[in-house]
Amino acid sequence: MTTELDPRLLSLLVCPVTKGPLTYDRETQELISPRAKLAFPIRDGIPIMLPEEARQIDA
């Protein structure tokens, strides 16, 4: 099940590692930090912003 992330919430959140902006990947239900090359999961509509919960990405 995919849920939409409120754009207002996305505008408030930053990467906990770089403090940079995040993008929302609807398909994978993750918040992407291009600078840190991390993908933070969204579980039950709640972004999990812990670096140890993120996965490395190649982007």
From Swiss-Prot:
Pfam families reported in the protein's UniProt record: Trm112p
UniProt-listed InterPro entries: Trm112-like
Any single GO CC term annotated in Swiss-Prot or TrEMBL for this entry: cytosol
Top-rank taxon, per record: Bacteria
Cysteine disulfide partners in this protein: none
Family stated for the protein in its record: Belongs to the UPF0434 family.
HAMAP family in UniProt: UPF0434
The protein, known as: UPF0434 protein GOX0764
UniProt organism field: Gluconobacter oxydans (strain 621H)
